[in-house]
Amino acid sequence: MTHTYPREAAKPVLGPARYDVWAPNAESVTLLAGGERYAMQRRAETGPEDAGWWTAAGAPTDGNVDYGYLLDGDETPLPDPRTRRQPDGVHALSRTFDPSAYSWQDDAWQGRELQGAVIYELHLGTFTPEGTLEAAAGKLDYLAGLGVDFIELLPVNAFNGTHNWGYDGVQWFAVHEAYGGPEAYQRFVDAAHAAGLGVIQDVVYNHLGPSGNYLPRFGPYLKQGEGNTWGDSVNLDGPGSDHVRRYILDNLAMWLRDYRVDGLRLDAVHALKDERAVHILEDFGALADQISAEVGRPLTLIAESDLNNPRLLYPRDVNGYGLEGQWSDDFHHAVHVNVTGETTGYYSDFDSLAALAKVLRDGFFHDGSYSSFRERHHGRPINFSAVHPAALVVCSQNHDQIGNRATGDRLSQTLPYGSLALAAVLTLTGPFTPMLLMGEEYGASTPWQFFTSHPEPELGKATAEGRIKEFERMGWDPAVVPDPQDPETFRRSKLDWAEAAEGDHARLLELYRSLTALRRSTPDLTKLGFEDTQVAFDEDARWLRFRRGGVQVLLNFSEQPVSLDGAGTALLLATDDAVRLEGERAELGPLSAAVVSD
């Protein structure tokens, strides 16, 4: 199936089509633009793609125009479903924005492949004291020096309130004004490319936030009464869904074309309920490939999925979806259990080095095996001939796994340097694509907590209660869970950059820099396939080792020293001074790791 995009995403910069709107539910639509009213007419239908569209004549086309829509005589103007700017909030008028006006300086940027890369996940509001795109741009040289290749931004689309994780967005085409708005976003991507960094934008297509969502007033964007964890499901396969899918695909095209991002992280794709013969994820992959060919650089789509289904990664010509990557939560769980000892909730199946060994070899732990947390079998095996290990994006910490702890405590708030070093070595030398959570690299002491700023008190209360209910199986004590609506919860989550130069923080930061440098200089760590990973371990002595080509990674999870034979002749990296390589015997101190070569 071949599609040519974008459609409405390419609204002319000038002319009345800028204000065209899909409102099949309306009997009449009036455009309010620049303080004047313009009666809109139904678009002449040449095919089903025109059904439900309205157009206006004579509306202003120059400058920044504030505008909205009056439906069926209602005197309250609604923002544009495709609004590019909401300077006064999600309930106010939209403002026109011309993305082609920006003068890009990144013509030399050739893009970046996922294989061999390191991703750095950050939230704009808490990454810097200012919480803006401009302030984040001031840290690009630091990130380049850290050795990362992609910056992955948590969602930036417009939401109600001042601060939020970003998953309550309601205007998918608009960049949140508190971050700087759409032009600031263009400047940030331009600056990132100048620093040699790609940008991956986290996007949410499975639900909309609870405040400021006017899409149902215009058309059947949602499946009323058919929901997921976060609200009504998006209408991907019901009546009118051709236009809804078009809306989403045009949004995907906007990020890749107008903002020149290098990839998208697709939030919770298991919640995209689509019974069509061609799943929308397949359309995503086809569109991204089309745009990649147009712009002449690689573009990457990474799915967050808890299905453990490698079909996401298989080529479309063999009935796959053709995405470049997907998250592997199993890797996180196996690492987490083995450095913390926690086995509650969904960690219960990962309470052994055997689980970690299986993940390193096979990519998934649950590949058709029984999941005690789900109380059913889960996942399917990966076809090693069809998928490279780099297609699995892994981490020891991320915004979900830390933020969805009762108090949002990072590993660095409870674990010693040695345990943090073990997690770092596993993540950055394993077969997969590593992703770091902002501040992880220096062992940030600040938590990453769940925060909201809903102006409506009832929404704030419902959010706090719903969150505790969602994670009741993790054994949370409600008394210690921070109030998401308390401004202090947000402020506590901001990084303290001063500590990165102090004590074990600085020591850990240097280890991360050494690990990213080692990845770049050691092809065996990044280029080999699944079948090239060999793993051995001793459950009682608590050591594990794995080989990739001519490189071995040795890890001691115990509080006692360990000696390992057959360790090679060259020490490439050690997590502390207690590590020794004598002949081909490695001496590892407690909670330490080494990378050696033959």
Curated annotation (Swiss-Prot):
The UniProt site entry described as Transition state stabilizer is assigned to D400
InterPro entries linked: DUF3459, Glyco_hydro_13_cat_dom, Glycoside_hydrolase_SF, Ig-like_fold, Ig_E-set, Trehalose_TreZ, Trehalose_TreZ_E-set_sf
Q: Identify the CDD domains for this entry.
A: AmyAc_GTHase, E_set_MTHase_like_N
Its UniProt pathway annotation is: Glycan biosynthesis; trehalose biosynthesis
Q: Name one GO biological process term.
A: trehalose biosynthetic process
A Gene Ontology term for the protein's cellular component: cytoplasm
Determine the domain of life of the protein's source: Bacteria
Q: Which reaction does it catalyse?
A: hydrolysis of (1->4)-alpha-D-glucosidic linkage in 4-alpha-D-[(1->4)-alpha-D-glucanosyl]n trehalose to yield trehalose and (1->4)-alpha-D-glucan
Q: Which residues form the active site?
A: D267 (nucleophile), E304 (proton donor)
* Keywords (A to Z) from UniProt: Carbohydrate metabolism, Cytoplasm, Glycosidase, Hydrolase
Amino acids binding substrate: 265-270, 329-333, 399-404
- Enzyme Commission code(s) on record: 3.2.1.141
* GO terms of molecular function: 4-alpha-D-(1->4)-alpha-D-glucanotrehalose trehalohydrolase activity
Where is the protein found, in the record's own terms? Answer: Cytoplasm
Q: Which Gene3D superfamilies match?
A: E-set domains of sugar-utilizing enzymes, Glycosidases, Immunoglobulins
- Which family does the UniProt entry place this protein in? Belongs to the glycosyl hydrolase 13 family.
Its recorded name reads: Malto-oligosyltrehalose trehalohydrolase
Organism this protein belongs to: Arthrobacter sp. (strain Q36)
